[in-house]
Amino acid sequence: MTNNDNIRLEQISEDLEAQRHSLNEQGQRLDRIETILTNLVTEIKIYDSKLDTYQKASQQIVNIAFGLLATSALAIIIPAVLNR
């Protein structure tokens, strides 16, 4: 093996080491991104649950309001009709 071959092999070895280091850093970044996304998915599920509860409660309030309106209307109409 010539001196130039040794230099070339050393250069290739250094390049491979740099790429390995870069891949490790990218892997760590991907792990951090995965953790962040997992946390976001968890938060979205919590907000989705809260929103679902809010929507159900709102619908119940609307139903109660219409029930009260119907009851009060009947409370006025029935005595008026029966007294005639």
UniProtKB/Swiss-Prot annotation:
Chain ranges passing through the membrane: 61-81
One annotated Gene Ontology cellular component of this protein: plasma membrane-derived thylakoid membrane
Subcellular location: Cellular thylakoid membrane
Chief place of localization: membrane
Recorded superkingdom: Bacteria
Record membrane topology: Single-pass membrane protein
Keywords associated with the record: Coiled coil, Membrane, Thylakoid, Transmembrane, Transmembrane helix
Coiled-coil blocks: 3-34
Protein name from the UniProt record: Thylakoid membrane protein ssr2422
UniProt organism field: Synechocystis sp. (strain ATCC 27184 / PCC 6803 / Kazusa)
